[in-house]
């Protein structure tokens, strides 16, 4: 039996110090965690955050400051647990304040 790969990726977060929804996290189960890489880009294609840990959380910071409100894109590369198959997923994040 090959386990399903399950994703949940919130598309909005609000890093505004109100104690709610302060970080953005990519939730995934059923992958080979050693083959994981997640990158968040601004509208100019610059990398503003990346993680090799599926449980990593982005706090909305880039270069020591909170990013501007807006739409950011993400790309996740991951490996299936029971094969060498590599996959890519992409999406967007709305940063609100």
Question: PLM features: residue spans?
Answer:
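Short loop/turn motifs at secondary-structure boundaries
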Residues: 1-97
């Amino acid at each position: 039996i090959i386990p399903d790969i399950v994703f949940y990726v919130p598309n909005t977060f609000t890093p505004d110090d109100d104690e709610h929804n302060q970080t953005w996290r990519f939730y995934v189960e059923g992958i080979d965690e050693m083959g994981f890489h997640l990158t968040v880009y601004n509208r100019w294609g610059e990398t503003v955050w990346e993680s090799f840990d599926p449980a990593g959380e982005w706090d909305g910071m880039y270069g020591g400051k909170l990013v501007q409100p807006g739409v950011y894109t993400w790309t996740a590369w991951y490996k299936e647990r029971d094969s060498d198959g590599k996959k890519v997923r992409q999406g967007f994040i709305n940063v609100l304040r």
